[in-house]
Structures are given as structure tokens and as C-alpha cells.
């Protein structure tokens, strides 16, 4: 006799409280319906021609593929804007004996402003940075077409997690 009442109680509790499950790590509030991503201009001192469009498109694609939100041109319930502020190549490691660079590091830094129209307290402004190391025998312009998408993927994952995984 106890068992039916426990099952009934569980059903009442389950029906009363809605829980969002997601394989992507996103937990978007039910009231959020749309998202918008403004073009991210490259304001870094050193500019890579493909970077702005690669970053902007990757962020749009991430939200399209991994959420139920519909993309709009501007004013989405989740709205992203910002700019690329850093694109730098530095020495990552050197040979101890000859002081020769073994690896170089390409680092991309992005300022992002996220507006959550459903819950303003969840809005934020943050700086994200990611990098990839590459063999110092290669010139940056030879390898950046391969490195930029890898770094952008890291940045987009971090931005996505910061905005959609906090619920």
C-alpha cells in the first residue's frame, strides 16, 4: 500500500517541477526563444582576414546546432556582440642550449557582451582568450588557416558555456 502512494507522489513532484536536460551542456530557460550574434570586428593590431567571419559564423552555428533557439538578426533573447582585441604570435618554448624557439603560440582574444533579455542578472561582459602552439619552423601565414578554426572552436565553446550552461 505504501508503494502506490510513493509512485503517485513522485509523479506529482515530477509534473510540478520542470527540469531541462541537454547533452550539449546547455540549459536554456523556457522563456528564451531567440538569439542574435552581431558581427565581431577585428580591432587587434595584427589582423587576419578570415578571423571576424570565422568567429561570428562559428558562434551562430553553435547556438543553431546545440539549442532550440531561433536565430534573428538583432535583439535576440540571448544577444552577443563584441570585438576581437588580440591576435598575437609569441614564442611558446625555447631550446635550453641554443635559446632557439621550438614552438610559437598564436593567441586570439575577444571581448564579448552577452545580453540575456529573459533574465538581465545573467547578462555579462567578459574577455575570452585561447591559443594553439605551432612549430617555429613554420611561418604564421602558412599555418593560420589551420590554427584559426581550432582556436575559434575553443573560444566559441567557452562563450557558449558562459552563456548557456549557467541555468
What are these regions (language model features)?
Residues 1-13:
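Single conserved hydrophobic/aromatic residue that forms the stacking wall/gate
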Residues 4, 42-46, 138-146:
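Short coil/turn segments at secondary-structure junctions
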Residues 7, 29-31, 76, 122:
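A short, polar/charged loop/turn motif at coil->beta-strand junctions and beta-hairpin connectors
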Residues 14-57, 61, 68, 73, ...:
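A structural "domain/chain start" motif
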Residues 23, 64-70, 77-123, 132-146, ...:
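Surface-exposed short loop/turn segments
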Residues 126-128:
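Short hydrophobic alpha-helix segments
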Residues 144-167:
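Compositionally biased, intrinsically disordered linkers/stalks adjacent to structured regions
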